Structure formats: C-alpha cells, structure tokens
Amino acid sequence: FVQPTIDDSYRDFKDYLVELIKGEDEMPDAFAAVNDYIALGAIRAMQELNVNVPITGFDDISFASYSTPSLTTVRVNKRYLGEVAVKRLIEKFSENENTLKIMVSTEIIERDSTK
C-alpha cells in the first residue's frame, strides 16, 4: 500500500522496488499510479535505484509537466465533474432518483515518463 503524498509514496515505492530487485520477480512492464503525487514519488525512487520503467499518473497536476521526466497522466475536466456531481446531488435529494451512471471524458497527456 502506497501513501498518497509525494514523500510517503517515494519511501513506500522505494521499499517496494528494493524488494522487487532483491527477489526473483521480474520488473513490471509499466506502472500506473492512482494519482500524480504517487507517480512523482515513484519517479524519484526509480531514479535513485536506476530503474527505468514507464509510469503514468492521474489528475494532471501542475507539477506533472515540471518533473524529470515529465509525467504522462490522465486529465479529467474537474470543473465539469464538480458541476455534474452537484447537479446529481440536488436531483437525488429533490426527486429521490435512483443511481445513474455518468461517464466523464478524459484525455491522456503523453509526456516523457512513458517514452
């Protein structure tokens, strides 16, 4: 389990990589982090251990484009997502509507961490 801060994810991911390197397991083909903070901490750990595996994040935070390598990530329109969430909450409370599946589009922002 990796903590969702850059510092904690760095430490946790570094520990994970050290165990992976010491063991006989093969290195994964790629890593996908649940958010950009975890991915950025993982990038630092991989750099220190000379591990070169593609990694992606999620959220497209501003730091993602400034890291080295710059982070490939998934961008979600958070403003739209918030608007839809508020609208659905109001509808749910006022009309007692059933659960509705809503799909929100995303965009892959390809940067250097997957090259």
Protein language model regions, located:
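Structural motif
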Residues: 1-24
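Flexible loop/turn connectors
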Residues: 18-115
